[in-house]
Amino acid sequence: MGRSYGGRVLAAMTLLGIPAAVLVALAAQLLFQLQAGRAELRRVRTDGLHPELDPDAGLPEAAAGALLPLATALAALAQVLGLSCLLLAALCGHLGAELARGPGPGRSDWFLYDCRLLRHSALGLFCCGVSVYLAALAIYALLLFEIEAGAAAASILGSGALILVAIMTHTLFRAVQATRRGLRELSPPSFEDEPARPSEDSKSGCRAQPPQDEETETPIGAVTHQGSHF
């Protein structure tokens, strides 16, 4: 039972670390694309708008110049959140695997049971990173495409980010409630210390038996002594 618990936790942390690494890579790619867009915007500012360009092809220059730093900051924040989630998942998985190699297999299960707050934090960081990345991607779509298509894409991505934040908040709140309820109603998984308890009980029982034997031997000795007087 202990090994199955630890195995499930390690598998969950692995499944969380893979999309966190993908999120870090996507945020880094978006950062480079936004940097290229900023260089293009600077070139347009220095060269001036060509008369043959359609002014309705995208956002105005002032709006684009204001949204580009915001999108860059959001992409960098998404990368930091994804990297933090990846490091927490890797740390919990590595320490759990190292403790499983010890003399007692229950040490790993106790550690993974006690670090559930870190696992909840890693999941929250990942969901926040995805939400921030969707917000940055919405701004980038608004800058890249035409006004109509960019506004539609930005609204869809922004609504998805808000829905994800709401789901994440509700899920983490329920997880915290379930954890507190489990700590009150359920006992933590028994792994290593319980097999030692019966041996201690048996030793204490063996130590308690000799005084009883002495008490039973005392009346017998008294009876034999009285018989000798008769």
Curated annotation (Swiss-Prot):
Cellular localisation: Membrane
Topological category with respect to the lipid bilayer: Multi-pass membrane protein
This protein's record includes keyword Glycoprotein: no
Electron transport found in the keyword field: no
Chief location category: membrane
Superkingdom of the source species: Eukaryota
Transmembrane portions of the chain: 12-32, 73-93, 125-145, 147-167
InterPro entries linked to this entry: Jiraiya, TM221
Disordered: annotated segments: 184-230
Keywords of this entry: Membrane, Transmembrane, Transmembrane helix
Residue spans of biased composition, Basic and acidic residues class: 194-204
Name of protein: Transmembrane protein 221
